[in-house]
From Swiss-Prot:
Keywords annotated in UniProt: ATP-binding, Cell membrane, Cytoplasm, Membrane, Nucleotide-binding, Protein transport, Translocase, Translocation, Transport
Membrane topology annotation: Peripheral membrane protein
EC identifiers of the protein: 7.4.2.8
Catalysed conversion reaction: ATP + H2O + cellular proteinSide 1 = ADP + phosphate + cellular proteinSide 2
Protein name: Protein translocase subunit SecA
Gene3D superfamilies xrefs: Helical scaffold and wing domains of SecA, P-loop containing nucleotide triphosphate hydrolases, SecA, preprotein cross-linking domain
One cellular component (GO) term of this entry: plasma membrane
Lineage, broadest ranks: Bacteria, Bacillati, Mycoplasmatota, Mycoplasmoidales, Metamycoplasmataceae
A single GO molecular function term of this UniProt record: protein-exporting ATPase activity
Domain of life, per lineage: Bacteria
Encoding gene, per UniProt annotation: secA
């Protein structure tokens, strides 16, 4: 009966997973008998099955069995049945709750492998880069064996490297970098610049930390700095004049605002009539930040000061959030409070919350040690169920009842006494704190007792994983924030089990039971023994904020030692549930506000993607002209209150804003003749004609086929600028939503209405500003060019309005290029001459001390002085070759002549000279120029060289004439052969 009851308690997903597990286990022997080659080749078989139309669920059992066998062979670890169960839940797009030490990393291998087979990319998101690198390296061995590629995405990588990492089959990355890459991808001006591909499947490690604890944290890319330190300093100075009676703090929400006394002081301090008039919203914003920084936020709790900078502390992990800062002026308010240099405030350029980013994935799943208490939120926000996976071995850790004391001092004394007691027998103890200041207080008390210990908090987090891993050694005392070292197993040193295992001592309750369970879960992994206990005081934040503190403290505040009785424990549990509900509501509120922005962001980003793909913007420009004209004709200085048109203002406006490039005079087209009902259509046609007939035609002339890239850049940059202004305005609108509380309206309703109005303005204003920029596109200016002739006879062109120093630089650089080419030609001349002689069957066969022996043709040899210049040798050798030709019979002469003609065909020589020296080659006319052959061999200035005697010139001229006659005959025969190929 008990088993039947447990069966019905089990979710439908987990019941399906059990059935699939049975089938996977049946495949174990089949795949276990395969060779490594055959096992790895299953990846190709699976891909073919998917290509033939099968779905992932059709190959799931086989793929899981293959991944299990590969893990066994490569890592030497056979995944337990519970790990396969966890993997199946992950593949179903749900959350798998697996206790600490149950092997979540191994459990992720089969579902990641299966989903990577689609070839659309799988992303594994982790909480820090250490875990990303560790898991990518370990699990990557299995994936590589199975023929899949693995990438690691890191913060410091350039765009090209990131693109390679995302193009891998499986990509490991920190969650924050995934979101920032998404935002950056939607700020590029070319589709090729994007680094991410489609958001297909994401498996989130420590999913509760990312999707619950950090859900309210927006990812923000900032820019456009403005530096107004006086405003922050004056607000800080004002807040320091206030006393407790001047403002109200809500302990539950940590909200703070001025009361009537505070408002009167603000009016007097800033010289205002009414602080909350709309024109004073910026002052209100600064005061609100200064109040929060000075009266609510605590140093070494929410932030620390490190190297003269404000560093944020993650309230759930205790880690420093490197590279992050508060937005909307809060960072500057903290700097003013701490007397630090006030950095310029930045403008939000792009932003998204983790909630909305991860909801972009087609398929999402996650694993963690504790999530069941937040299941309803996972269902409502992410449509993910939470399934608790049973442990591989029974859990035998003892979770002792909380010890509750009246004061913090009593609690700390009891903690030190307990540490001394446990340490005496050598049992390792891990003390979990939620705040840096608490860890430092306990550390000082332990030092006073002479107890050696290690502290891990936001100030010492460099060796986090290493420190946590050593916490299981004998006599070890480790103080750490509750979530430090998450994802790192604490291995018990031999002999520690006999001492009772790892002792977990919590120093206060977290805002979620889930966080407390995470701390407990550091002990008792894989059936190990262990113990956990929490020490609490009535002065802890949980009691102060979420109970009737005065009543509780009045009843128990004088108690010595631990407070007994069930009631106080019930109050503690109720307070924890209350804050869980409060935080859930806060996250829902953040999500509801962000959903308004999300819908607008989706529209803008979808529009950007279209603009990145198309190459003809005419249709868009026509639409934008219509919107621009509509805006122009709604300006109150053009359309007067009586609906009359101020034509002069209209003409001046058009000439000032739309005529800089074309110098078009709108006063000469008869605008005054058109009444208001016809003016709109008339202006649209005029602007279309001006743009497409004048501006775009010049754009095409100047930029060629890629003219549209200039249009794309203008349209995108205008859209981005307007969007960035919009989200900056919306951020301020959201932060000041409480200013409408006196209007008896729902702040969210007011926010939604105002955000929608402002978005409509954004769309219209983007179109108008884009048209103004397109009509003033400097690339569309007509440019007159001047031609200059260089020393080699080539010409270059430059804009007529170029400064003289620029012209001189252009000419000088080209002359340097020409000189370098000439030098290169001279250096290659010997090689060129030898090459040409070789083609004429003239080659050097022997070289002595004074003479060189050259061979001409197949028989003739001649000795030449070694010191003779190569061009003189060339002259003599070619001349002797010509003489040899004259002494041959007509038949031999024709044969060699044909061979030579094949070698010195004009097209071949011209092409070769061009390759050797990219200068202009003059055409050599063999038919009409008797010196053509020698010009070809010796160069175009042959006539100026006196290389042979006049008598020899006469003989050479005769030879050239004979050669030309032979050439004509050969050409004629070649042409005849071309006409009659059979002959």
């Amino acid at each position: 009966m008990k088993n039947l009851f447990n069966f019905f308690k089990t979710s439908s997903e987990l019941r399906l997973a059990y059935r699939l597990l049975k089938q996977i286990n049946q495949k174990r022997s089949f795949y276990g008998a395969m060779t490594d080659f055959d096992l790895a080749n299953q990846t190709n078989i699976f891909k073919k099955r998917l290509a033939n139309g099968e779905k992932l669920k059709d190959i799931r059992v086989d793929a899981f069995a293959v991944a299990r066998e590969a893990t066994k062979r490569i890592l030497g670890k056979t995944p337990y049945d519970v790990q396969i169960l966890g993997g199946l839940i992950l593949d179903m797009g749900s959350v798998a709750e697996m206790k600490t030490g149950e092997g979540k990393t191994i459990a992720s291998i089969p579902p990641v492998y299966l989903n990577a087979l689609l070839g659309q990319g799988v992303i594994v998101s982790t909480v820090n880069e250490y875990l990303a690198e560790r898991d990518a390296e370990d699990n990557g061995k299995v994936y590589n064996f199975l023929g899949l590629t693995v990438g690691i995405n890191k913060t410091e990588m350039d765009a090209n490297t990131k693109r390679m990492m995302y193009n891998a089959d499986i990509t490991y990355s920190v969650h924050s970098e995934l979101g920032f890459d998404y935002l950056r991808d939607n700020m590029v001006f070319s589709a090729a610049e994007k680094v991410q591909r489609g958001l297909n499947f994401c498996l989130i490690d420590e999913v509760d930390s990312i999707l619950i604890d950090e859900a309210k944290t927006p990812l923000i890319i900032s820019g456009g700095k403005t530096n107004l330190p006086a405003q922050y300093l004056s607000a800080n100075q004002f807040v320091n004049t206030l006393i407790a009676e001047d403002f109200y703090i809500d302990e539950e929400t940590k909200g703070i605002k001025l009361n009537d006394k505070g408002i009167d002081k603000a009016n007097a301090f800033f010289g205002l009539r009414n602080l909350y008039e709309i024109q004073n919203s910026e002052i209100v914003h600064r005061i609100q930040n200064a109040l929060r920084a000075n009266k609510v936020m605590k140093r070494d709790v929410e932030y620390i000061v490190q190297d003269g900078k404000i560093a944020l502390v993650d309230q759930f992990t205790g880690r420093i959030m490197a590279g992050r800062s508060y937005s909307e002026g809060l960072q500057q308010a903290l700097q003013a409070k701490e007397g630090l240099e006030i950095e310029p405030e930045t403008k939000t350029l792009a932003t998204i919350t983790y909630q909305n980013f991860f909801r972009l994935f087609k398929k999402l799943s996650g694993m963690t040690g504790t999530a069941k208490t937040e299941e309803q939120e996972f269902i409502d926000v992410y449509n993910m169920r939470v399934n608790v996976i049973p442990t591989n071995k029974p859990m035998i850790r003892k979770d002792e009842r909380d010890e509750i004391f009246a004061t913090s001092h009593e609690k700390n004394q009891a903690i030190i006494s307990e540490v001394e007691r446990v340490h005496k027998r050598g049992q390792p103890i891990l003390i979990g704190t939620s705040q840096v200041v608490d860890s430092e207080t306990l550390s000082e008390m332990l030092n006073q007792k002479g107890l050696y210990h290690t502290v891990l908090n936001a100030k010492q987090n460099q060796l986090e994983a290493e420190i946590i891993a050593k916490a299981g050694r004998k006599n070890a005392i480790t103080i750490a924030t509750n979530m430090a070292g998450r994802g790192t197993d604490i291995i018990l040193e031999p002999g520690v089990t006999e001492l009772g295992g790892l002792y977990i001592l919590g120093t206060d309750k977290a805002e979620a039971r889930r966080i407390d369970n995470q701390l407990r879960g550091r002990s008792g992994r894989q059936g190990d023994v262990g113990i956990s206990r929490f020490f609490i005081s009535l002065q802890d934040q949980l009691f102060r904020r979420f109970t009737n503190f005065d009543q509780i403290f009045g009843a128990y505040g004088q108690t010595n030692g631990a407070i007994k009785g069930k009631y106080i424990h019930a109050v503690l549990l109720a307070a924890q549930k209350k804050i869980e509900g409060f935080n859930f509501d806060m996250r829902k509120t953040v999500l509801s506000y962000d959903d308004v922005i999300r819908q607008q962001r989706d529209l803008i980003y979808a529009q950007r993607d279209i603009l990145l793909q198309i190459e003809n913007f005419d249709h868009y420009i026509q639409k934008m002209i219509i919107r621009a004209v509509d805006i122009i004709l709604n300006y109150d200085f053009i359309i007067l209150p009586n609906q009359e048109i101020h034509y002069k203002n209209l003409i001046n406006f058009l000439n000032d804003n739309l005529s800089r490039i074309t110098h078009f005079n709108f006063g000469q087209i008869g605008i005054e003749n058109y009444p208001i009902e016809q003016l709109n259509e008339f202006l649209i046609k005029q602007l279309e004609t001006i743009y497409f007939k004048q501006i775009q035609s010049v754009l095409k002339e100047n930029l060629g086929k890629t003219y549209f890239e200039s249009e794309r850049y203008i349209i995108l940059s205008t859209l981005d600028s307007q969007w960035q202004n919009h989200i900056d305005t919306i951020d301020k609108l959201r932060s000041s939503a409480n200013l409408v509380q006196y209007s008896q309206k729902n702040p969210y309703q007011i926010f939604t209405e105002e955000a929608t109005k402002k978005f409509n303005i954004l769309v219209a204003e983007s179109a108008y500003q884009a048209i103004v920029s397109l009509f003033n596109n400097s690339n569309a200016e007509k440019i007159e060019y001047i031609k200059a002739i260089l020393s080699d006879g080539t010409a270059i062109s430059y804009p007529a309005d170029s400064p003289q120093e620029i012209i001189d630089q252009i000419i000088a650089s080209n002359e340097e290029r020409i000189a370098a080419a000439r030098k290169a030609k001279e250096e290659k001349q010997p090689e060129f001459i030898e090459k040409q002689l070789a083609k004429l069957k003239i080659e050097k066969v022997e070289s002595g001390e004074e003479f060189e022996l050259w061979k001409i043709g197949d028989s003739k040899l001649v000795n030449l002085k070694k010191e003779m210049p190569l061009d003189e040798k060339q002259n003599i050798l070619v001349k002797m070759q010509q003489e040899q030709l004259e002494m041959m019979s007509e038949e031999e002469k024709n044969l060699i002549q044909e061979q030579n003609l094949e070698i010195v065909e004009i097209e071949e020589i011209e092409e070769e000279i061009q390759n050797e020296n990219p200068q202009k080659v003059e055409f050599v006319d063999f038919k009409n120029d008797p010196d053509a052959y020698n010009k070809l061999i010796f160069g175009a200035d042959y006539a100026d060289k006196q290389l042979i005697s006049s008598e020899e010139e006469d003989n050479n001229e005769k030879t050239n004439i004979n050669n030309n006659e032979d050439l004509e005959r050969t050409k004629g025969e070649a042409q005849q052969t071309a006409k009659n190929p059979n002959e």
